[in-house]
UniProtKB/Swiss-Prot annotation:
This is Protein SSD1. The keyword Membrane does not apply. The gene is SSD1. Can suppress the lethality due to deletion of SIT4, and partially the defects due to BCY1 disruption. Is implicated in the control of the cell cycle G1 phase. GO terms for cellular component: cellular bud; cellular bud neck; cytoplasm; cytoplasmic stress granule; nucleus; P-body.
Length: 1250
């Protein structure tokens, strides 16, 4: 056992309690959190339930005692007789009242006090999402903080002999691990630890008064804003209908809400056995259901409408209702099937367990490389994410779920992980007897790792194991991997699952194919925490409950009778004659396989499954019982052919929860409902607005990012007294939409517009866009922010915010504005606007010499996606930067305004600073590059990156920095500590979204808040209702960002495929970003993509990694062209993908000749049809970056080869790969897949010159 494990084990024996200062987690975070220990995975949950049950019984007894005492006192007062013995007793014993959370009377006044927990919504309870605690719960309660060891039952659901940790002890262990790293000379992160002893004066001799679980609320604690008695009645969305309803906006039934199908007494629970449900009436309707009477159209608005608010993940129940989960049934459930997962803890108990520090709440993020593993982000409660090892510990949680996690000793989890990976290797070895073993510290799932033996104090890439199911293990037993015979002499047969040649790993073929999809289907590589034997996770845990799941989620994918892993061995895995299950493979790799009952599949699917192999379907998950390895779901609709461009776009929208049917007329689904029209403004409502319509006085120009709709306008005026006036005007959309109306509810449901190169999904109906868009000479109602600036310094002297009307003189698209600004001779008017924007930017990053370009476009995209989409995600024009900087200033001004007046109710936007461990890793990487700038503050970090002169290096470092940062989030001020309001990437202390109400619903909320401030009227919205809205807007905004990125990737793949249509691949220059022992990452600037070059895809003899100097040496087979090379294990047609057919037909020399010839003749590589398509979309065709050799006598291929660093030692042909080096690579697109992929290879520099 490792040193860490011994430390933790010794610590569990200590009699004294230990406390660690919390790092965040909400406005009511605890000062100290106790620790508990256990010996098996299920023991603590049993103890919890027993304690809660006993505590409630104790509270009932105390309440009865209190009533009896009160009756005795009343009787004594009436009779005038006092019993001296009773009097003395009464002076020393005052029974505790029942905790309001457990009152049987749901209408008790105590339910609205500090102890109340709203059950009408999700992700709005600070006890869940912000890990909120009562500061006084533990400070005077040492009995509850003591260590406990009980005789545990056998661990039937998980791993035996693992210790559980309270939040406090987990932080202590993490701090010790960090301290050891620092003492060893490694860059790390310090964790603040406070050793606090429990107050001895609070100790009691009686267990009844000493232990209170959960503790009673402190009568003297401060007012809690989240649960104030002043709050209005609970929020209901949509509101009750008043009068006639002119639309068919119908709430979705619970059978279509994933979060409503769990633990619901009216439907099969998530823990239920699906086989036992066959006798129940079928509640799941599907368009493919083979019962005509129940057929429904799942494309209708009524059916697919996700709920307007988040719904509670589990139905509220008394805590005793889940005791059956831990009954004496052993390994079997009530139906006799083996339980594969642990049942969830009852929802009613979890808030108090979180308050006690026994559980932590957070958002689960699936490890895309190994989908059974995951990480949980705790929103600041911990200084690092929690590692979840294996599907059992993940316990059926999905990407984006809000989960409750019990922390475990890291060493125990890590040892278990290593044992499982070794077991996996042995099982794979039964089918692969000629392979060389990996070192025990190697990562089975990642050939980009750096082991302790070769890393020389460098962090490795993530590793994780899959302790999954019998089915998954059987799949891995059947994996086979053969390698190039040219290097067989280098190794000897052993018992292992992955072959190694020096530092070069050989992945199984199925793993290669999986990596192609994981790495190839995104623009940038997705990285997780860097962990290995030397740098273990700081925290580990297992999921004990899913608190909330985003409702109404849909997934696109393909349908088959066999699992994808079985299809590779289809000869030996023929489907049964009458299969009961079809397998739905989601396009999103983070979503598990979904079992679809064949009766819900197309009618002829079983007989003609091959006919549907190229079809895309939409499915949803309905349940996931503890007895099943996979979730069960239903098919919602058939999208169409997998190669159809329209189907591809629809698939992206469905995967990201945009159905685009909110405004459609049910009578004519091809059109929007004609009754959706903006409310007209009366003359009286316009009178009190400030008037900016005089075109002689105000030269207002509107900005149209897309060229046809405008919501933002500017004017600049010289006041003549040494000041300038900058007016910023935003369309007053909410004046035209009644709050709570049908349009308002539908806009809230859509929440965000989606901007893709191929398609636009607006937030509002088209009639609103046409009517409300700013236009020259058209008077429009706006909300304005007017700054008075000093003419010389451009500092703000005063600010006016209010309602207004404007009449723009002109309208400019971003392209037109950029053209005027980039000509070098813009008008003085536009020059003034540009200089004001530069001044705002310089002050924002605290750099007086700052210029608008270059900009950190990736960091800025963490807050908001682009409206004018480019094919390269890194592209930013000067016009875009100028307008965006002014908008940021307006947004921050409005944020200050509403927060000053509304306080806790203000809807704001923040971005948390990166997790300390991720920032330490980033700092280590840039130090390896030779850069060492300050990373302690956002402004210094931004300035440090911007000062890098080399564009490729600067962008490369920005990519690495981008991966350390979370996306910005909406929040309600009263739910977050004020010191966490800041927006890190923008370096602003307070921020919100205000300037885009025609594409973001969050701006509608801010507009209404601002109007309440302007008119000095009470803002009556409930804080909990605002919390629901903010969380839903966060979810849909992230979906909109992902949809945009996937659509860009789709079009980029199409473009690259077209450019390389003649040769199958492109040859271009790339910059090396990171080097590992078996692979390296490259960045291709002209396409804005980052990809990984795998050593086992190249004709290499071996590879050697120098961890000290960060150099990877590739030992090439001379004369073998990597452009036409196919590894031996991929030559079997059944072992690889059809998408690479004809991709290796041209040699590297032919590719180089064609590219350089076309460049010399100024001929485009792209075809005319695609060139026209991109031109119509206002997109620029990428230009390949080709080498420029001074020696004109070199042929085309030699020009590329001359950029490499090579040497020949004896018979070894070696290429050196350094970080930040520019090397030639081969790029290809694979478009015959549900989502196309981009893959890269390195060019072999040791080929015959032709």
């Amino acid at each position: 056992m490792s040193k860490n494990s011994n430390v933790n084990n010794n610590r569990s024996q200590e009699p004294n309690n230990m406390f660690v200062q919390t790092t965040g987690g909400g406005k009511n975070a605890p000062k100290q959190i106790h620790v508990a220990h256990r010996r098996s995975q299920s023991e603590l949950t049993n103890l919890m339930i027993e304690q809660f049950t006993l505590q409630k019984q104790l509270e009932q007894v105390q309440a009865q005692q209190q009533q009896l005492m009160a009756q005795q006192q009343q009787l004594a007062q009436q009779t005038g007789q006092y019993l001296s013995g009773n009097s003395g007793s009464n002076n020393h014993f005052t029974p505790q009242p029942p905790h309001p959370h457990y009152n049987s009377n749901g209408n008790s006044p105590g339910m609205s006090a500090g102890g109340s927990r709203s059950r009408t919504h999700s992700r709005n309870n600070s006890g869940y999402y912000h890990n909120s605690y009562d500061n006084n719960n533990n400070s005077n309660n040492p009995g509850s903080n003591s260590h406990r060891k009980t005789s545990s039952q056998s661990s039937i659901y998980g791993h035996s002999r693992r210790h559980s940790l309270g939040l406090n002890e987990a932080k202590k262990a993490a701090a010790e691990e960090q301290a050891k790293r620092i003492s060893g000379g490694e860059a790390g992160v310090t964790v603040k630890i406070d050793s606090v002893q429990a107050d001895s004066g609070s100790n009691s001799t009686t267990e009844q008064s000493d232990f209170k679980f959960p503790p009673p609320p402190n009568a003297h604690q401060g007012h809690r804003r989240a649960t104030s008695n002043l709050s209005p009645p609970s929020f209901k969305f949509p509101p009750n209908s008043h009068g006639d309803n002119d639309d068919e906006f119908i709430a979705t039934s619970s059978t279509h809400r994933r979060s409503k199908t769990r633990n619901n007494e009216y439907s099969p629970g998530i823990n239920s056995n699906w086989r036992n449900q066959s006798q129940q009436p079928q509640q799941q309707l599907s368009p493919f259901r083979h019962r005509g009477s129940n057929s429904r159209d799942y494309n209708s608005f009524n059916t697919l409408e996700p709920p307007a608010i988040f719904q509670q993940g589990h139905k509220h129940r008394a805590s005793n209702s889940s005791v059956h989960s831990f009954s004496s049934q052993g390994n079997n459930n009530g139906g006799g099937r083996k339980s594969l997962f642990a049942p969830y803890l009852p929802q009613a108990n979890i808030p108090e367990l979180i308050q006690e520090g026994r559980l932590v709440a957070g958002i689960l993020r699936v490890n895309k490389k190994n989908r059974s593993d995951a990480w949980v982000s705790t929103d600041g409660a911990l200084d690092a994410d929690i590692y979840i090892c294996g599907s059992k510990d993940r316990n059926r949680a999905l990407e984006g779920d809000l989960v409750a996690v019990e922390l475990l000793v890291v060493d125990d989890v890590w040892e278990s992980k290593k044992e499982k990976e070794e077991k996996k290797r042995r099982k794979d070895a039964s089918m692969q007897h000629d392979l060389i073993p990996l070192n025990s510290s190697d990562d089975y799932h990642n050939d980009a790792s750096v082991t302790a033996a070769t890393s020389n104090n460098f962090l490795s890439s993530p590793s994780s194991s899959d302790s999954l199911s019998k089915d998954d293990l059987s799949v891995r037993r059947k994996r086979s991997s053969t390698i190039n015979n040219d290097s067989d002499s280098l190794s000897s047969p052993t018992k292992s699952g992955v072959r190694r040649r020096s530092s070069l790993k050989q992945r199984p073929t199925q793993k290669k194919n999986d990596d192609v999809e994981v790495e190839g289907q995104s623009l940038l590589l997705v990285e997780e925490e860097e962990i290995n034997d030397k740098y273990k996770p700081l925290y580990a845990g297992h999921v004990v409950a899913v608190l909330d799941r985003i409702p109404g989620q849909l997934f696109s994918g393909t349908l088959g009778l066999l699992r994808p892993s079985q299809q590779a061995n289809s000869d030996n895995n023929k489907p049964p004659q009458s299969p009961k299950i079809a397998w739905f493979k989601p396009t999103d790799k983070k979503v598990p396989l979904i079992a679809i009952p064949t009766e819900l599949a197309p009618k002829d699917f079983v007989e003609n499954a091959d006919k549907y192999s190229e079809k895309l379907f939409v499915a949803s998950i309905k349940r996931w019982p503890i007895t099943s390895l996979h979730p069960f779901g239903i098919l919602v609709s058939e999208l169409g052919d997998i190669h159809d461009p329209d189907t591809e776009i629809d698939s992206i929208l469905r995967d990201n929860n945009f159905l685009s049917n909110e405004y459609l007329d049910q009578k004519n689904p091809q059109k929007e409902k004609p009754s959706f029209q903006p409310l007209p403004l009366t003359a009286e409502s316009l009178e009190y607005r400030r008037n900016f319509t005089d075109t002689n006085e105000y030269n207002i120009f509107a900005i149209s990012e897309l060229g046809w709709v405008s919501e933002f306008a500017l004017h600049v005026r010289n006041n003549g007294n040494g000041t300038l006036e900058l007016g910023c005007h935003v369309v007053d959309v909410t004046s035209h939409i009644e709050e709570g109306s049908s349009v308002d509810r539908r806009a809230r449901k859509r929440s965000s517009a989606v901007f893709m190169p191929q398609k636009l999904v607006n937030l509002l109906p088209q009639s609103f866009n046409d009517e409300l868009s700013l236009a020259p000479g058209k008077e429009s109602a706006t909300l304005s922010v007017v700054y008075t600036l000093d003419s010389s310094t451009l500092r703000i002297k005063s600010t006016w915010v209010g309602e207004s009307t404007i009449s723009p003189s002109n309208i400019l698209s971003l392209e037109q504005l950029d053209e005027k600004l980039s000509t070098g001779s813009p008008t003085s008017y536009l020059s003034t606007v540009q200089e004001i924007a530069r001044s705002f930017y310089a002050r924002r990053i605290n750099d007086p010499e700052a210029t608008l370009l270059p900009t950190l476009s990736l960091l800025e995209s963490l807050d908001d996606e682009k409206v004018k989409v480019d094919l390269n995600i890194l592209d930013r024009t000067l016009g875009f930067v100028v307008i965006n900087e002014i908008k940021r200033k307006v947004n921050s001004t409005v944020a200050e305004k509403i927060y000053t007046k509304l306080g806790d109710l203000a809807l704001l936007r923040r971005q948390m600073q990166p997790i300390a461990t991720k920032m330490a890793s980033f700092r280590k990487k840039i130090q390896n590059f030779g850069y060492n700038f300050d990373t302690n503050t956002a402004d210094e970090l931004i300035k440090g990156v911007l000062k890098i002169k080399d564009d490729d290096v600067r962008v490369g470092i920005e990519i690495l920095l981008f991966k350390t940062m979370p996306r910005a989030r909406y929040f309600i001020a009263g739910k977050v500590d004020p010191d966490q309001y800041g927006h890190y990437a923008l370096n602003l202390p307070i921020y919100t979204h205000f300037t885009a109400p025609m594409r973001r619903y969050a701006d509608h909320v801010v507009h209404r808040q601002l109007k309440a401030v302007i008119h000095d009227t009470p803002y009556t919205e409930d804080m909990e209702a605002l919390k629901i809205t903010s969380e839903y807007c966060n979810f849909k905004k992230d979906c909109a960002y992902q949809a945009q990125e996937q659509a860009i990737h789709l079009l980029l793949c199409k473009t690259i495929n077209d450019m390389g249509n003649t040769t199958g691949q492109l040859l271009t220059m790339a910059t090396v970003l990171q080097v590992y022992e078996s692979s390296f990452d490259v960045f291709i600037p002209e396409f804005g993509i980052e990809k990984r070059v795998h050593g086992d895809q190249l004709p290499l003899i071996k590879a050697e990694f120098d961890g000290t100097n960060r150099v990877l040496e590739l030992h090439w087979q001379p004369g073998v062209d990597s452009a036409t090379f196919i590894p031996a294990d991929e030559k079997n047609p059944k072992s690889y993908r059809n998408s690479i057919k004809n991709k290796f037909r041209s040699t590297a020399a032919e590719i180089a000749n064609i590219e350089l010839d076309k460049e010399a003749e100024s001929e485009p590589l792209i075809s005319d049809p695609l060139s026209k398509e991109l031109s119509d979309l206002h997109l620029t065709v990428p230009n390949l970056r080709l080498p420029s050799a001074s020696d004109n006598k070199q042929n085309a291929l030699e020009k590329f080869i001359s950029t490499t660093e090579t040497r020949i030692e004896n018979d070894n042909y070696i290429q050196e790969i350094h970080e930040l080096q520019k090397i030639p690579i081969l790029l290809r697109a694979e478009v015959g897949m549900a989502l196309p992929c981009l893959t890269v290879r390195a060019l072999n520099p040791f080929m015959k010159r032709v």
